[in-house]
Amino acid sequence: MSAIVPEIRSADLLRYTVIGSRRPSVYFWAVALTGGGLGFTLAGLSSYLHRNLLPFSDPASLVFIPQGIAMLFYGVLGSLAGLYQWLSLYWNLGGGYNEFDRRTQKITLVRQGFPGKNREVRLEYDFADVQSLRVELREGLNPRRAIYLRVKGRGDIPLTGVGQPPPLTEIENQAAEIARFLNVSLEGI
């Protein structure tokens, strides 16, 4: 699954949807952490209550101190981590869009954050302030493939989302399309 999905392409408007936390890996970890946390919590409670709360095991025979309390502690931590994953999926943290509009000569970058006053992060730049587009390609154990917008006085602003790096051809094509649309140079390829 790509980090950037083209949504609108026209002569005057280019818009990409950026996938935030709603990636398959986050769904996997949300399910795994919730299930594991619930299992450990029930095992710890079973040892405390001396009553089997798990149908596939007999944790009631565990001694509460130290085994049961450790299971309960790790179960609560796992459940809280699972809850965080589910909330990040619900809130779609990091999701948003990149919009390039020739009519207004504006670039709008929108990302979703945590609930509150500043839930939506919105950055706007003029076409005239864009110096170039930079592509970062790093292979190896922790690969990185990202597109950055180089803006005067602002440095490099990432346009790609987090997660699994998109295929090399896809990142090159997207960077070339954006650079042509903005009429700026492309660095790093």
UniProtKB/Swiss-Prot annotation:
Presence of the UniProt keyword Transmembrane in the record: yes
Q: Which InterPro entries does the entry mention?
A: PSI_Ycf4_assembly
Superkingdom of the organism of origin? Bacteria
- Where in or outside the cell? Cellular thylakoid membrane
Q: Does the keyword Membrane apply?
A: yes
One of the GO BP terms on file:
photosynthesis
Main subcellular location of this protein, as a coarse class: membrane
Which keywords appear in this protein's UniProt record, sorted alphabetically? Membrane, Photosynthesis, Thylakoid, Transmembrane, Transmembrane helix
Read off the HAMAP family from this record: Ycf4 (MF_00437)
Q: What is this protein called?
A: Photosystem I assembly protein Ycf4
Q: Which organism is it from?
A: Synechococcus sp. (strain JA-2-3B'a(2-13))
